[in-house]
Regions:
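A conserved ligand/cofactor-binding region detector
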Residues: 2-184
């Protein structure tokens, strides 16, 4: 799009591993994980000031809000991760257009639950960390089983939720009426 002189803004997931890297070993082709971020990536800019919280699951409780004179919706019982944006410039060919690709990394809200660990619940102690890691670890998990389908859905929901939150926050900085968002 940048080469065609279109201003655009893309979003995706900052996967830690690509699908695979091919190597020849003992005369045979083998596939190994592609750890493309092992040495960092110089063309990306970490933007923690624009981090978003993404919720999975839970339920919504409705209660009356006397200040607003209406209903208030409260999301509870969910799992959450922090979506950290990394911005990458996408330059056009033979023009001055530079677009942005924002890719989201997932981090735990709480790194380690010492209380759970001390009680012997080792799985719960690292649950947040594992949820975040699983979302961004590998591009296209095998989804021929339930766990793979669930992870792919979480990955898609993760980057859509973070991207929409960012777009709405950016809109609200300059505009008061959210009902006119469609005009922009």
């Amino acid at each position: 799009l940048a080469t065609l002189n279109y201003a655009a803004y893309g979003c995706g997931i900052r996967y830690h591993y690509g699908m695979f890297k091919q190597k020849i070993q003992n005369g045979y082709q083998i596939e190994v994980p592609d750890n493309w971020l092992k040495n960092g990536y110089p063309f990306e800019l970490r933007r923690p000031e624009y981090a978003k919280e993404v919720h999975f699951g839970g339920y919504v409780r409705v209660e009356y809000d006397p200040e607003k004179g209406g209903s208030k919706f409260i999301h509870e019982g969910y799992q959450a991760v922090k979506a950290i944006p990394y911005d990458m410039p996408i330059t056009g060919y033979d023009n001055d257009v530079v677009n942005t690709l924002r890719i989201w990394d997932a981090e735990p809200i709480v790194d380690f639950e010492l209380d759970s660990f001390d009680k012997g619940d080792y799985k719960k102690a690292v649950e947040q960390e594992n949820l975040a890691r699983n979302i961004v670890e590998v591009l296209y998990p095998n989804d021929n089983h339930y766990a793979g389908k669930e992870l792919r859905l979480k990955q898609q929901y993760f980057f859509v939720s973070a991207s929409l939150q960012a777009a709405i926050a950016k809109y609200k900085k300059k505009h008061d009426d959210i009902h006119k968002l469609y005009e922009k």
